[in-house]
Amino acid sequence: FSIKMYIPNLYKNENQAEIEQFISENGFAILVNQTNGKHWATHIPLILGTNSDGKQILIGHISKLNPQAESFKQNDEVLAIFSGSHSYISSSWYDHENVPTWNYLAVHVYGKIRLHSFEESIESLKKLVNKYEAKSEKPIRIEDLSEKTMREARGIVSFEIEITNIEAQKKLSQNRDDKNYKNIISELEKTNDNQAIAIANEMKKNR
């Protein structure tokens, strides 16, 4: 795939368990491919799984009206971008003069797409709905929906992406000494901003 993520070695994440958890917790992704000679992107939920060969895959679907749907038949290479928490880091939080920066977590997943049959697409929808209905007080199930409602499933293109490569980055002020690192965490926690606090928690886990 022609798009790559710039990752300084200090911020590279190669912990497979962490990456899998990150994808599971931040499943709303951007699916990118080449469509009609241009890069095309769609925001969709994707879930991590394994295929019958035991290989890791991402499962999802898009509308049949989306130009990407037709392009998958000609070009099976895709990129899924997963973004996590992020926050501004003020240089006023350091004990020395420096420039501000931004801390964040991100994962790029590269793979080859395979379109599902209608039967497979129903199974895919079940997995997606079951995952996100799990916290609902009255969870719905695909199996319980009427035939009329399920006709809408004919309007989607379901697929799985066999993962060929993963690039993961966690930029969490790893270049700072312990004193400044701890102060960044403290200042982030004072903001009462959910994103900032999430980054503070990630920093605590990282050192």
Over which residues does each language-model region extend?
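C-terminal edge-of-domain segments
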Residues: F1-M5, F118-R207
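Short, basic/aromatic recognition patches
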Residues: Y6-I30
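A generic local secondary-structure boundary/capping motif
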Residues: E20, N98, K148-R151
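Short beta-strand segments
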Residues: E25-K64
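Structured helix-beta-strand junction loops
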Residues: E25-N26, Q74-N75, T191, N206
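A generic structural signal for short beta-strands and their flanking turns/coil linkers
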Residues: G27, T42, G54-L58, Q74-V78, ...
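Residue-level recognition of well-ordered beta-strand positions that form the cores
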Residues: P45, H61, I81, K112, ...
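Short, structured beta-strand-loop surface elements
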Residues: L65-E123
